């Protein structure tokens, strides 16, 4: 039985999606200020590992718990929605099926409380 990780193209696909997502974040007027001053190479590596893990790939995320990482950022629902929108769009451009994109976004949504630190 294949996993969501396999179905979306594994590590190379996740890395490409995250790279494209970061380009979108950098030009998004809502999101860019949140990431100002962030080490984006480190953030990229954490995000790739996090997504790989929640998509049933290798257990490689070794960062702090999400709620601790995002404490003090004052992330709100519009921030989450914008990132989810960009993530879904980047997955579609990468050729991930609508079904697998929805499954991936559902898994990210399941983490929303920790992501928004609420």
Swiss-Prot record:
CDD domains membership: TrHb1_N
Binding site for heme: 70
Keyword Iron: yes
Cofactor binding, note field: Binds 1 heme group per subunit.
Pfam families according to UniProt: Bac_globin
SUPFAM superfamilies: Globin-like (SSF46458)
TM helices/strands, residue ranges: none
GO molecular function: heme binding; metal ion binding; oxygen binding; oxygen carrier activity
Alphabetical keyword list: Heme, Iron, Membrane, Metal-binding, Oxygen transport, Transport
Membrane topology of this protein: Peripheral membrane protein
UniProt subcellular location: Membrane
A Gene Ontology cellular-component term: membrane
CC cofactor: heme
UniProt-listed PROSITE patterns: GLOBIN_FAM_2
Origin superkingdom: Bacteria
Family indicated by similarity: Belongs to the truncated hemoglobin family. Group I subfamily.
Subunit structure: Monomer.
Name of the molecule in the record: Group 1 truncated hemoglobin GlbN
Annotated organism of origin: Nostoc commune
Gene name of this polypeptide: glbN
